């Protein structure tokens, strides 16, 4: 396993604990991002469906508004000069709000009326009904246009947010988590190898001590058999174990 495939870290119990915590954190982050992506995708599909419905309705409303304009011009004559002369400031205005979906801020536009209707008395002489119908149809068209602008802006914002979230999920799932898992496997392998080496070393030391003990007991028996007087061992004296070397 090359160093590029795993995180450079000294194998130890502490490193193993750290890697386990990092792995758990990465898995939790991946799961949360997947839930976020699912929530964004659900809202994305809802907005897409709403855009299609609004565009279909928009076509009908604009067609009806065009017919109303033709009827009003036929009945009341050319009233464009009157409209232009009465223009002072916009009566229909737009304000923006913010909506939050799984941490993503979406702009929401809504229209509102400000001031009085400058064209309230237009059409009193003739064509009043057609002009009123014309204003209603174009007011509906403005409302749908504002709604469509809000939906399309949210659509683009969500599309970009979903792509970014999915890229993060893929990076965690296919790069970060496998790298941590390989690092954890490396640490476990190294620790197991150390334990085997330590076990083998202790086993050889015990075997060496056993051989020395048997040899010492055998020498003691031979000396007793030869009639030598043996001094009792001083239990309080400091004894230093002989360094045991083995091949």
Curated annotation (Swiss-Prot):
This is V-type proton ATPase subunit D. It is a peripheral membrane protein. Gene3D superfamilies: 1.10.287.3240. Belongs to the V-ATPase D subunit family. GO terms for biological process: cilium assembly; endosomal lumen acidification; Golgi lumen acidification; intracellular pH reduction; lysosomal lumen acidification; protein localization to cilium; proton transmembrane transport; regulation of macroautophagy. Keywords: Cell projection, Cilium biogenesis/degradation, Cytoplasm, Cytoplasmic vesicle, Cytoskeleton, Hydrogen ion transport, Ion transport, Membrane, Transport. GO terms for cellular component: centrosome; cilium; clathrin-coated vesicle membrane; cytosol; endosome membrane; extracellular exosome; extrinsic component of synaptic vesicle membrane; Golgi membrane. One of its GO terms (molecular function) is proton-transporting ATPase activity, rotational mechanism. The keyword Membrane applies. It is found in: Membrane; Cytoplasmic vesicle, Clathrin-coated vesicle membrane; Cytoplasm, Cytoskeleton, Microtubule organizing center, Centrosome; Cell projection, Cilium. The keyword Iron-sulfur does not apply. It comes from Homo sapiens (Human). The lineage of its organism: Eukaryota, Metazoa, Chordata, Craniata, Vertebrata. The gene is ATP6V1D. V-ATPase is a heteromultimeric enzyme made up of two complexes: the ATP-hydrolytic V1 complex and the proton translocation V0 complex. The V1 complex consists of three catalytic AB heterodimers that form a heterohexamer, three peripheral stalks each consisting of EG heterodimers, one central rotor including subunits D and F, and the regulatory subunits C and H. The proton translocation complex V0 consists of the proton transport subunit a, a ring of proteolipid subunits c9c'', rotary subunit d, subunits e and f, and the accessory subunits ATP6AP1/Ac45 and ATP6AP2/PRR. Interacts with SNX10. PANTHER family: V-TYPE ATP SYNTHASE SUBUNIT D (PTHR11671).
């Amino acid at each position: 396993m090359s160093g590029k495939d795993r995180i450079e870290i000294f194998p130890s119990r502490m490193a193993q604990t750290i890697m386990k915590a990092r792995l758990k954190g990465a898995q939790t982050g991946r799961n949360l991002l997947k839930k976020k992506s699912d929530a964004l995708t659900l809202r994305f599909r809802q907005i897409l469906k709403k855009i299609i419905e609004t565009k279909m309705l928009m076509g009908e409303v604009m067609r009806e508004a065009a017919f109303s304009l033709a009827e009003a011009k036929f009945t009341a004559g050319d009233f464009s000069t009157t409209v232009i002369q009465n223009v002072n400031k916009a009566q229909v205005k737009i304000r923006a709000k913010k909506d939050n979906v799984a941490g993503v801020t979406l702009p929401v536009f809504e229209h509102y009326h400000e001031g009085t209707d400058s064209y309230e008395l237009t059409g009193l002489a003739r064509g009043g009904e057609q002009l009123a119908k014309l204003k209603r149809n174009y007011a509906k068209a403005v409302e749908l246009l504002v709604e469509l602008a809000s939906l399309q802006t949210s659509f683009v914002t969500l599309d970009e947010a979903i792509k970014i979230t999915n890229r993060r999920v893929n990076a965690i799932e296919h790069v970060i988590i496998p790298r941590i898992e390989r690092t954890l496997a490396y640490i476990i392998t190294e620790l197991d190898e150390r334990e085997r080496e330590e076990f083998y070393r202790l086993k050889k030391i015990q075997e060496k001590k056993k051989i020395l003990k048997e040899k010492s007991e055998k020498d003691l028996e031979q000396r007793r058999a030869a009639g030598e007087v043996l001094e009792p061992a001083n239990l309080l004296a400091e004894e230093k174990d002989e360094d045991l070397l083995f091949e």
